[in-house]
Amino acid sequence: MENRVSLGSIQKAVWDGRLPLEIVLASSESRTFDKTDPYLISYPRISYLPSLLPKLRAFFSNFLIDPNSQSHDGWFEFEGVPLKWHYPVGLLFDLYAGVDPASKTAARDNESPGDGSSLPWRLIVHFSDWPPDLVRLDAYGMVMNDAFINSVKEADFLRNGTAKGIMSLSKEDSSGLWNAVQEVDLLSFQRISNILLPQPSQPFRNVPIRVFLPLLPDAESSSLKVVQTPLPPSIPASSMQSSQILTSRSGSTLQPQTVGTVLHTLLPNLFPSRRTPVLAKPVLHGAVIPMSAPIEEVVRSSAYGDGWAYIVVRMMG
């Protein structure tokens, strides 16, 4: 019971997490060039940037050179990189802005490294010249909804070995899951997501986890490098404390798969140790997660709304 309470409190903290955003209209699309006031908001980490577009379109409407542009024409840019709208904003921040401040130029406005200069996160919104490598949005939000549900299906298949759970949801619950994420309604989300999750006494078939490799500061390409493979929540036991040893149906002894064993398996050169970060550290929701944390518990408590734990690898030193 204590474990359930603990996991529940972590999930609540994840859903309560917010990022301060400062969004400006692209100067090339503004009647006043770069003189428009920024749009400031404290935005939930689990939310998606396109949900802001109607408010942004209204906020900047008097300054747009093209008055016929629509909110679903909008897209976001950070330091020249178009942001992938199907990723939650918290993940995007961890990928592009949540880096070691010492590796950034010290000085926007003569700020020194380490003083929190990456916040608020400064983004540029465009309402024209849609990037060719981004899927276009539609006026009714169906493209966003479909992308989210498809991601939920993938996670459901990994957890259960089948996507029957999400496929058998009523239309009301299926749309309700996406609405709960948009509205940051954790109670409504839990009611529906608990239908899809195996009971705590029943382990996942595989854990839905994606690991994002570090972005090179001067890389010519903005494409993300993602590592993903089916990973069971338990592995053959080694030298573990007896309290951590499990027994499989076949009688073999197992131990919980941890963040450390996952990263050592996927990226042994970056994570030569299963217990201690040496060259890189794993970041989820802006925090470094312990290498000893059981990966299934991490997913149950800290997955984004689509059921995936998105771990960002950040280099040390």
UniProtKB/Swiss-Prot annotation:
Conjugated with atg12. Conjugated to atg12; which is essential for autophagy. Keywords: Autophagy, Isopeptide bond, Membrane, Protein transport, Transport, Ubl conjugation. Gene3D superfamilies: 3.10.20.620, Autophagy protein Apg5, helix rich domain (1.10.246.190), Phosphatidylinositol 3-kinase Catalytic Subunit, Chain A, domain 1 (3.10.20.90). It is a peripheral membrane protein. The keyword Membrane applies. One of its GO terms (cellular component) is phagophore assembly site membrane. This is Autophagy protein 5. Belongs to the ATG5 family. Involved in cytoplasm to vacuole transport (Cvt) and autophagic vesicle formation. Autophagy is essential for maintenance of amino acid levels and protein synthesis under nitrogen starvation. Required for selective autophagic degradation of the nucleus (nucleophagy). Also required for mitophagy, which eliminates defective or superfluous mitochondria in order to fulfill cellular energy requirements and prevent excess ROS production. It comes from the Eukaryota. Pfam families: ATG5_HBR, ATG5_UblA, ATG5_UblB. The lineage of its organism: Eukaryota, Fungi, Dikarya, Ascomycota, Pezizomycotina. One of its GO terms (biological process) is cellular response to nitrogen starvation. GO terms for molecular function: Atg8-family ligase activity. The keyword Cell inner membrane does not apply. Its main location: membrane. There is a cross-link at residue 153 (Glycyl lysine isopeptide (Lys-Gly) (interchain with G-Cter in atg12)). It is found in: Preautophagosomal structure membrane. InterPro entries: Atg5 (IPR007239), ATG5_HBR (IPR048940), Atg5_HR (IPR042526), ATG5_UblA (IPR048939), Atg5_UblA_dom_sf (IPR042527), ATG5_UblB (IPR048318).
